[in-house]
Amino acid sequence: MCIRDRDKYLGTEELNLILREEIAGLLSEINSGNDSEFSLTSNHKPYVIMVVGVNGAGKTTTIGKLAHQFRKQGYKVVLGAADTFRAAAIDQLQVWAERVEVPIVKQNMGSDPASVAFDTLESAVSNQADVVIIDTAGRLHNKVNLMNELTKIKRVMHKVVPNAPHEILLVLDGSTGQNAFEQAKQFTAATEVNALAVTKLDGTAKGGVVIGISDQFQVPVKYIGVGEGIEDLQVFNKMEFIDSFFKK
């Protein structure tokens, strides 16, 4: 029976229940978590997060807010400024590091990103940090360049922390619709993305892109950005997210 036919027999509550089940199915078991706290999901120390995504998606802001949340939970955090293609990227991460009071490892613009990642992990190990968050370049000329750059960074990380990075977090702008799909396609093809952070889901952006991207690429959504404030990065809660579509 199609939904149009079911309209004759089902009320609003029944239809909402069907829609909830459909959305839950699209988000799939990979988004089964109902956590609300920022916590580490592994015993690796340091736990290394490599953050990827295009410039303008909210990558640096997400890193800063993530560092803030982990620090609030009592974790010792180190940032690595491995987006060395833009001076602004290094400067912006420095501002966030100062704001949330965590150390940052950086070099000059044009430096080898893999070298920055190596230095960051060495610093984290020597200082017994719990979490390392590495920023990476958002724009390379093509997918091959992107893949080569990220592969090199990972290879160098392995020399310091054998299984690093433990998480490759792709940051997507939830308000850009089809562009977010294209970015997800590019980055999931270039490296082993295993978590998503979807930003700018406040205002008119309703978050439908979250459902489509998670379903198509089979990568769990881990964080959502719902505003400009430092506290406006949330751990993705599947049931709360689905409920938000049905609030009156």
Which role does the model predict for each range below?
Residues 92, 113-127, 141-247:
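Conserved catalytic-core segment of NTP-binding enzymes
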Residues 83-84, 174:
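Residue-level signal for short, function-critical loop segments
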Residues 4-82, 89-109, 117-125, 129-134:
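Primarily NTPase-proximal linker/entry elements flanking Walker-type ATP/GTP-binding cores
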Residues 137-139:
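Short glycine-rich anion-binding loops that position phosphate/pyrophosphate groups of nucleotides
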Residues 1:
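Nucleotide/phosphate-binding catalytic cleft detector across ATP-hydrolyzing
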